[in-house]
Amino acid sequence: MKTRLVKHPCPEATIAGAAARVPAAIIAAVLLGITASPARADCNPAERINASCYSNLQDATTAAIAANQPLWLPAGTYVLNRELVIDYAPLAATGFQIISDGAIIDATATGNRAMSIECSGGSPQDAKGCFYFHIQGTLFVNANSAQAAVRFGFNDFSDAHNSAKIDHLIVNNAGPGYAVRLNYNLNADIFAVAVSAGSAGLVMDQVQFSRISGAASATRGTAMRIERGYSFANTIQAIDLEVAQIGLAITSPYANRNTFVSPYFNCPTAILATAGNSNMLLNPSYGAGQPPAPGSQTGVLTLP
């Protein structure tokens, strides 16, 4: 996973070159083979791990989790050669934070998923409870994959992510897969722009009492899907669903009492709901196609 950055390069100093800039104690530590602090202050910021000071993003992530410190992504492009796995199980009780200054994670060349946020150690019968994952700032993620570009939680629901917060996540999957897939997220607050050239932009699989906003599109598919597991008591607000054949599809029989506040649909087919109960659209707007006829969509109520 090679990192290519626009800013904050790390020094590659020899011991002789370092002598002019660092104390003798650090030089002695280097000569003794002991790991010393980097000479540049921006490669050793207080209380955070600077990803630009590592040869690859996976190593930086592992170091941040081990140190129980936020992972800082300075502005720049981080090119992956394999999937970035963020397994914050060691911090399941207190959470893990990523601070992004408009960084771009680019997995386009791999053909695989770009990023998986997970919490190992559970099972489908006994999911591991994990808390307080947070992406602060704006983070861009690019992929070209048949998988979801960003997956939050294992597909088998073996990790339950509680009280996550994602400030501003922009995901673009140029392949046939999903852009963003949410698996077993509870009491989350997520703003995502989920764009796919393929089957679905934003997919909610077992999401409960969470707040979701942003935008979703899928050129050859469905902008937003609620399709597996128990998804209920969610508020989806100020969301833009467009550039897709279908705006919203609800196929899970356990999708109940979700409220869409002022959603905007700009797709040939705005809504296709075949399952669920008491899912409400409050004050929806339609930019293309016709609003669904009253009573034509299973479990969907519209006001006004």
What are these model-predicted stretches?
Residues M1-A20:
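N-terminal secretory signal peptides that target proteins for export/translocation
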Residues E12, N44-P45, S55, G121, ...:
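Residue-level detector of bioactive/disordered segments in secreted/extracellular proteins
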Residues R21-T35:
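Bacterial N-terminal signal peptides
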Residues P38-D59, T77, P304:
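Right-handed parallel beta-helix/beta-solenoid
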Residues Y54-Q58, T62, A67-Q97, D101-G111, ...:
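N-terminal extracellular ligand-recognition/capping segment immediately after the signal peptide
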Residues T61, E83-A89, N112-F131, Q147-D159, ...:
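Glycine-rich beta-solenoid repeat tracts in large extracellular/virion proteins
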Residues L73, A93, Q97-S100, Y132-Q136, ...:
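All-beta strand scaffolds that present successive hydrophobic residues in beta-strands
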Residues A107, V141-A143, N172-N173, S196-G198, ...:
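Residues in short coils/turns that link rungs of repeat/solenoid architectures in beta-rich domains
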